[in-house]
């Protein structure tokens, strides 16, 4: 039997504040510490998932923010590595669903009409996980689709595109001339 040693409140606060820090060295040390915890004590991450989802979600959100917005490439890479190790510690929770043909068990794409391996019709198949169907044509659809690949029906309203600074990749307003985060000139004065 494995004895679970959960993260102390001090450790949790240290990780969250370290990931929020504006000092790159502090972020890097925190990322490495989190990697070590995920590798050496994965049960501590699982414990967080079970008993302190708020902190775990905050850690994952902060890692994603570093990956998306941090101007330092080394920190972005370390955050990606850390996130993968945390996901690995959490196990199958983050694995992606790949639909398999009911007849031949080959991987299929929900955009296909027939299995490319055996010719079975995909519309009539059932899957282990619940897969949405198009309200217009009743074919299976993917969560990420904006339009149905079978009939072209609109599935989602288009999200407003967020403008980002080409230099630091942070969100900027269209009327801004200079990025307030890094000083990059966004457009010329009229």
Swiss-Prot record:
Superkingdom as given in the UniProt entry: Archaea
Keyword Signal: no
Coiled-coil positions: none
Zinc finger (DZANK-type): 134-183
Keyword annotations of the record: Metal-binding, Zinc, Zinc-finger
Pfam family, one: DZR
Record GO terms (molecular function): zinc ion binding
Protein known as: Double zinc ribbon protein MJ0416
């Amino acid at each position: 039997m494995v004895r679970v040693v959960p993260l102390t409140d001090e450790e949790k606060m240290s990780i969250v504040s370290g990931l929020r820090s504006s000092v790159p060295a502090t972020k890097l040390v925190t990322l490495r510490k989190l990697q070590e915890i995920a590798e050496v004590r994965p049960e501590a991450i699982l414990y967080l998932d079970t008993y302190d989802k708020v902190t775990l979600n905050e850690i994952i959100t902060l890692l994603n923010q570093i990956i998306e917005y941090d101007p330092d490439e080394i920190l972005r890479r370390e955050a990606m590595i850390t996130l993968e190790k945390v996901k690995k510690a959490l196990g199958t929770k983050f694995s992606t669903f790949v639909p398999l043909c009911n007849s031949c068990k080959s991987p299929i794409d929900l955009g296909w009409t027939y299995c490319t391996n055996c010719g079975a019709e995909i519309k009539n198949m059932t899957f282990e996980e619940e897969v949405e169907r198009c309200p217009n044509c009743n074919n299976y659809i993917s969560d990420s689709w904006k339009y149905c690949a079978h009939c072209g029906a609109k599935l989602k309203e288009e999200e407003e595109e967020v403008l980002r600074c080409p230099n630091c990749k942070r969100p900027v307003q269209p009327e801004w001339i200079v990025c307030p985060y890094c000083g990059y000139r966004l457009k010329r004065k009229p």
